[in-house]
């Protein structure tokens, strides 16, 4: 660990013209992998933070809002989620949340960057909380696109696919995983009542990228849910798009959500029946241009 002797700050770009400035107290990791720049630092306001290619991915103090919102609406909406595929999510927090559901028998996490996974195991224990060692976990270091294509050839099937990738506009690593064609492959990988959910960046600063992801999901799934949640360390509300082949997350009551969470032994800090209803009724925030 390198202590920061003077004021060093991270400037995270929110858009091409706006940045979030964050004071760094200590640097644990600063390196470039084969695929991206990796930074793990300590900050006052957000705690230990993972940064990839200058974009914050997760921070100790607020990561639950992102990961619980990404995972639980989809997994809870499915009545019997047994097999779950996670694309991305190298720090292990998405895997952690998936494994809270005792119905899950197999959770496959596929991340292209093995350095992120190994560094997260060492420096981000509060995020993964031992999820990598759970006997239900299967961690694969490979391109998510290639994994999905090969899984289709093998005849694999999943109940839920969770896409916890870098933003569609932040780097080139995951761009091909946001295309309509790829969502079509995901649809084929799902069982007949399967669900996919993806983070979709920010609809305010990058409306075109968000709409591209949304239309890709809409073109392949009959049931759609759009929702968002404010993430302080991101400096914006992150958007999510859920696509379902049968089960509608809007149809669940708060009581039914709480019942499923209780029956499955899920202990969440943010997500609940009331939170589910709120998320499903959250408007998508976009710029309102007045001339």
UniProtKB/Swiss-Prot annotation:
Gene Ontology process terms (BP): polyamine biosynthetic process; spermidine biosynthetic process
Q: Which Pfam families match?
A: Spermine_synt_N, Spermine_synth
User: PABS domain spans which residues?
Assistant: 5-245
Q: Where is the active site?
A: 164
Compartment annotation: Cytoplasm
**Coiled-coil ranges per UniProt:** none
| GO annotation, cellular component aspect | cytoplasm
Give the InterPro entries listed for this entry: PABS, PABS_CS, SAM-dependent_MTases_sf, Spermi_synthase, Spermidine_synt_N, Spermidine_synt_N_sf
Function field? Involved in the biosynthesis of polyamines which are thought to support the growth of thermophilic microorganisms under high-temperature conditions. It seems that long-chain and branched-chain of polyamines effectively stabilize DNA and RNA, respectively. Catalyzes the irreversible transfer of a propylamine group from the amino donor S-adenosylmethioninamine (decarboxy-AdoMet) to norspermidine and 1,3-diaminopropane to yield norspermine, and to spermidine to yield thermospermine.
HAMAP family recorded:
Spermidine_synth
The subunit structure is: Homodimer or homotetramer.
Return the similarity comment: Belongs to the spermidine/spermine synthase family.
Q: What is this protein called?
A: Polyamine aminopropyltransferase
The species is Pyrobaculum aerophilum (strain ATCC 51768 / DSM 7523 / JCM 9630 / CIP 104966 / NBRC 100827 / IM2)
Q: What is the lineage of its organism?
A: Archaea, Thermoproteota, Thermoprotei, Thermoproteales, Thermoproteaceae
